[in-house]
Every structure is written in structure tokens, then in C-alpha cells.
Amino acid sequence: MDTEGSSEQGKQTKEQVCSSLWPEGYPAAETVTSSVDMNTQPYRNLSGVRVGRPKLSLQGVQRGRPHSRRRHRTTFSPAQLEQLESAFGRNQYPDIWARESLAQDTGLSEARIQVWFQNRRAKQRKQERSLLQPLAHLSPATFSGFLPEPPSCPYSYPTPPPPMTCFPHPYNRALPSQPSTGSSFARPYQSEDWYPNLHPTPAGHLACPPPPPMLPLSLEPPKSWN
């Protein structure tokens, strides 16, 4: 009986101590944690404004941290790069069929090959711009030094040679008349018949005579020798 009375007195003293530490209107220490987690009813502060009770959750903490996205880089072997470069030299814009066949040859995926071709075209355009950029700053006077200089004097043409002086041909004399035997002999042409439209020549120069006329051939039948 004494032990039971002492235990009841001890409980009463503990309750008195707890009530002295915690003022009236506040829950006990055992119910504080549950009220923070479960009770979400708004309460009034000293100024009289209703403020919602904050919620604590792990999801909000995780959302505040930015997720670091890692980019997966593909490493190409020298043999794969050689095949890709040769295909790029043939066609810079391969279609789906060419990319799939190239994927089978290289062992890469079609998406990786498509990305490689896009990066390779961008690299080529960058190289072309870097080559053209120094030439854009040059003035036209700079290019004039590479052009050949014009000749100092105009082109000279050779003077035509003087006209040749023609002398009378020894056969220009009239041929002796030959006996005509009817229509068997043809009449020799005169010198006037050869050049009827010659222009007059200046003084001191004689016109070149025509070649000597051919003698007419005899139309008699050949004699037979017995």
C-alpha cells in the first residue's frame, strides 16, 4: 500500500512540474510533433492575421535542388571516323537509307550518325567562314598587286611589204600565126582574155602577165605502124 501511494504522489508531482513549464493553452510536449505534421488548420498570430501553418515535406527539398543532367558523349574509333568521313565526302546530306546502311557498317546507331553529320556540317561551315574572314578585310588595292601590268606601248602590227614590181614575161610576145586546118585547131587566147577586170596599176609598176598559153594539140588520129 505504501508503494502505491508513493507512485501516485510521484505522478502528481510530475504533472505539476509539466504544467508549470508549459503555460495554459499550449499542448503537451508529447503532442507537439504530431501537431506539426498533421494539424494544418490556420491559426492567428498576435497581429490577428490568419496565416496558414507551413508544411514540411521532402519533396519540396528535392525540388529545390537542380538536377545535374549529364551528357553522354560517344567515342568513335579511327575506323569508324574513316568510314564517316568518306561517306561525308560523297554526300553531306545522307537520307535515312544511307544512314541505316552506314550504321550497319560502323556498328553505331542511326541517331548517332545523324548527329555526327549535323556536327560535321556545322564544323565545315565554320571553317569556310574562318577562311573567308581574312579576305573580307583586304582592300581592292591589295589585289591589284597580283594582276599583270598592262603593256606600256600599244601593240604594233607589221607594215605591209611594198608591191612587187613585175617585169614583162619573155613569152608575152605574139605567137607566130599557124596555118589553120579547119576546126581541128583551137584559137589561142589573147592576154586580154585572162584578166578582164584588173584595176589600173600605178605608174612605174607593170601588171604581171598571164602564163604562156598552151599550144593546141592536134586532133588527127594516130598513125598505125605496120
UniProtKB/Swiss-Prot annotation:
Superkingdom of origin organism: Eukaryota
Cited InterPro entries: HD, Homeobox_CS, Homeodomain-like_sf, HTH_motif, PROP1
SMART domains according to UniProt: HOX (SM00389)
Keywords on record: DNA-binding, Homeobox, Nucleus
Tissue-level expression: Exclusively expressed in the developing pituitary gland.
Feature: compositional bias, Low complexity: 216-226
MF term (GO), any: RNA polymerase II cis-regulatory region sequence-specific DNA binding
PROSITE patterns according to UniProt: HOMEOBOX_1 (PS00027), HOMEOBOX_2 (PS50071)
Gene3D superfamilies in UniProt: Homeodomain-like
CDD domains, per the entry: homeodomain
Membership in a protein family: Belongs to the paired homeobox family.
Role according to the record: Possibly involved in the ontogenesis of pituitary gonadotropes, as well as somatotropes, lactotropes and caudomedial thyrotropes.
Protein name: Homeobox protein prophet of Pit-1
Gene source species: Bos taurus (Bovine)
